Amino acid sequence: WQQNIPQYTHLNWDRLYNVNYNNFDANGLRRSKYVIEERRVDQNDVSLSTHVKYQPTKFFTLTGGMTFRWNKTEYYKQIDDLLGGDYYVNIDSFAERDFASNAAMIQNDLDYYFKHGAAQVLSVGDKYGYDYYANVFDETLWGNIKLDLGGFKANLSVKGGLNEFYREGLVRKGLFPGLDEDGKEIIFDGKVLTTYDAAGKPITSLGKSDI
């Protein structure tokens, strides 16, 4: 390829088409060994945010809010072009090289294989290889109390929430048929800050503070 020889710097489309076109099965149909795939990322996202402020007197102020995010994204690929063939078989060609004697291990859709006794036969537009959802839930509540009593000022803040993420597989692969563990994180944070105007320095500081 460093000498810019075309057969190394470009795909040999004629060869790909010829391999598929001449690869006949027992029924006289052409089984594609090479295809063009389309990798898809289909995303759904909902975000909400609220903010409230309550000040019954000039000495006391309460603020708070909530944020919520839900995201569900599907990752999959589908057949875009059979390159001269009639169909494609939904198996892992790399696994077939190493585990050819174990039909279950080479399946991209293990449940389909168990149900039908054979690998899935695909046409243009069919999903194959992998298909799963990535789910994210992020919920946060926060609040702040502010006291202003002449020379004495105080702030109390608290934040809590839940962050959850997990993968939802839509097919089971023969090499890795098990389930993934869910991820879940509980968020909590708080801070207390008091000041006295005579000195202008904090006399109490607990938790995280940007002041």
Spans of features found by a protein language model:
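Outer-membrane beta-barrel domain signature, strongest for Gram-negative TonB-dependent receptors
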Residues: W1-K72
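Signature of Gram-negative outer-membrane beta-barrel scaffolds
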Residues: V35, T61-I211
